[in-house]
Amino acid sequence: MADEHTETRSGPTHSGFVALIGAPNAGKSTLVNQLVGAKVSIVTHKVQTTRAIVRGIATHKNAQIVFVDTPGIFKPRRRLDTAMVTTAWGGAKDADMVLVLIDAQRGLKGDAAEILERLADIRQPKALLLNKVDRVKPEKLLELTQAANARVDFARTFMVSALTGSGCKDLLDYLAETLPEGPWYYPEDQISDLPMRQLAAEITREKLYLRLHQELPYSSHVETEKWEEKQNGSVRIEQVIYVERDSQKKIVLGHKGETIRAIGQASRADIAGILEQKVHLFLFVKVRENWGNDPERYREMGLEFPR
C-alpha cells in the first residue's frame, strides 16, 4: 500500500505525531501497518501484544504523519500491565492529534467505555475511528457514532477496516490537511523509528505469541544479542527468549526442539523479507526468574518501571 499513500508534493510541508489509542485487540497495530504500508508493528490474535510505543511513518501528499502505536488500554493486573497502560496515555498526551479506535463489533463496552471517560484529560484534537465496519450493520454504526460523540467532542468520525484498508485514504487525507505546517522529522524513505535489532526481536515475539497459548507468551521477553553483517551480504542474528521458569523453557523448546524451530523459521522469513537479505537466525531460551520485576528489562522495552 505504500505507493498509494505517496503523492506529488507542492506547497508547504506538514508534519506531526498522531497517537492511536484503544482497547486491546481493537486493531491498532494492524491499522498502523495498513496506513504506513509496511509491517512496523507486530500483530497477533492475543490481547496486549504491543508492549511499548512503536512509531510508524507515513508520507501522504505534502505531509509526514508519524503514527504512534500504543499498548492497549485495560485494567492492569501486573506491574508490566501498569507500565503499558501508563505508556499508552503518555503517548496520547505527547501527540499532536489522538485517534481513538473502537472495535465496532464490540461497541462501547468495558475498556472502550472507560477510555472514552478518561479522554476528558486529553486536550489534543481527537478523531473517532470505528474499525471492522465491514462486519457491522449500518444502523449499529450510526448508533455507535452518535453514542461516542455524545460522550466525547470528536473533531471527525471515520469508518475504517484495518484489515482491508477501507477508509484509510480518507483518514490520511484528513491528517495531511490537519497536522501543523513544519519540516519533516524523518527521511522520506523511513517507515519506523524502531531500530532493526529491536524490530527483529519484536517479530520473534510475535511468532512466539502465535505459536504458544495461555499465559506463557506474557511471561516471555525477546532480546537481540548479536547482529553481524557478513561479507557475503547475509546477516547473522542471535536472539534470546527469556522465560521465568524451567517448565516454560521446555514448552518453548517443544518436543525435540520442534516449537522453537518453527518459531525461528517463521521469524527468519519475516526478518529476511524486511531486510531483503539472507538471514541466519539463531534462537536460545534462557530462564530469567522474575524478569517482569526487573527495571532494566523495562528500559529495554521503552517502558517506565512502575514503583
Model-derived features with residue positions:
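Conserved glycine(s) of the Walker
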Residues: 27, 167, 259
